[in-house]
Regions:
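Acidic-basic catalytic patches of nuclease active cores, encompassing PD-(D/E)XK
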Residues: 94-220
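Active-site beta-strand-loop-beta-strand hairpin of nuclease catalytic cores
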Residues: 202-224, 230-247
Length: 344
């Protein structure tokens, strides 16, 4: 299915024909819940977010090589996908109505997925350059100080909701973390390693088998590509030490005032456990938002890292970089440009 449908209604690729066939096959992007409506809710239709992406982005990954216009904003891709979805509803259901609330329920996840896919493809370009010395992208620009070094390949990994970061640790590192956990539990305390939305990792050398998947870009955001993106972290479990963690990214379209401190807490915990308990280098923590309106994100995210204050010397921010992630290409380029700065 195309990102934008043929405007000729008689064409075989016109939306009425495509959406009707999709719905008839049981692969539609909407679920009619009017019959089995949840008590106390007025929801009539629910969006199947995987199918929305599978339909709208079955030919390219936004902001990367293969995208007909990689300069577009995240918002433009999502707006077109939702327009396709609304039209599909009008084609397939009488009395169709889709509330903005239903769109909002999937919007953040789709935004995060698009960013993760763009970063994945940027990392694949980087890894090819590390191995061959050839820059094979026309969308991304090679960081001028990047030195092709096969041992400096990276994996930029989308973590699953509720995933356990400690599962990525090898046996020795997990034992160190477990000893730390047990010591706290003996005093009735805990400090769990949080799971960010996206992790940037140095691929171990020699490369474990599960990392081979990060050498190739995703061609699109079909269901198959989404599954790769969502499940890749499970294939690299039990492989990492603290030194392999480069950066973490919290991805949100926006953040409410009552959620401001969640990222700050996650950043401090990650930096303490990875830097002190597991004796890795200083991990960097990024917050990527589409808008900072509605809360004092800029002011609050100037907070110093508690770890750097306790260590003395020059303090650092808990959240190293607050970035307005408006376009997938620019967002991925920013991360690419930072990769040469990691000493190890």
């Amino acid at each position: 299915m195309p990102f934008q449908f043929n405007s000729d209604p008689a064409h075989s690729d016109a939306q009425p024909a495509v959406c009707a066939a999709c719905h008839a096959s049981g692969r539609g992007c909407l679920v009619d819940v009017r019959v089995n409506r949840v008590k106390g809710r007025d929801t009539q239709f629910q969006i199947v977010q995987q199918r929305v992406m599978d339909c709208a982005l079955d030919g390219f990954v936004p902001g990367t090589d293969g995208d007909p216009d990689p300069s577009r904003a995240f918002l433009e891709y999502r707006a077109q996908a939702y327009a396709n979805t609304r039209m599909a509803g009008s084609i397939n259901f009488s009395g169709f109505s889709l509330s903005q609330q239903q769109v909002a329920k999937v919007d953040g996840d789709i935004y995060e997925l698009m960013e993760a896919a763009a970063l994945w493809n940027a990392a694949a370009v980087w890894n090819n350059f590390m191995d061959t010395g050839n820059w094979n992208s026309t969308v991304f620009t090679r960081p001028p100080v990047a030195v092709p070094t096969p041992t400096r390949k990276v994996a930029i990994v989308k973590m699953s909701r509720g995933g356990d970061t400690t599962k990525l640790l090898n046996d020795a590192a997990r034992a160190e973390y477990r000893a730390f956990e047990v010591a706290l539990q003996s005093g009735g305390m805990e400090l769990r390693l949080s799971t960010p939305d996206i992790l940037g990792l140095r691929i171990p050398n020699p490369m474990p088998p599960g990392f081979g998947i990060f050498m190739n870009p995703l061609p699109d955001l079909t269901n198959a590509s989404q599954a790769i993106l969502e499940q890749a972290w499970t294939g690299i479990q039990s492989t990492l030490e603290g030194r392999h963690f480069l950066f973490a990214i919290a991805v949100k379209t926006s953040t409410r005032s009552d959620r401001l401190y969640q990222a700050l807490f996650e950043a401090n915990v990650l930096k303490y456990i990875l830097g002190y308990v597991l004796r890795g280098p200083a991990i960097k923590f990024h917050a990527h938002l589409e808008t900072t309106k509605g809360s004092d994100v800029v002011g609050r995210y100037k907070a110093a890292s508690m770890i750097s204050l306790l260590a003395g010397g020059t303090p650092n921010k808990a959240i190293d970089d607050l970035y307005l992630a408006l376009r997938p290409r620019d967002t991925a380029q920013k991360i690419l440009d930072s990769l040469p700065s990691y000493p190890l």
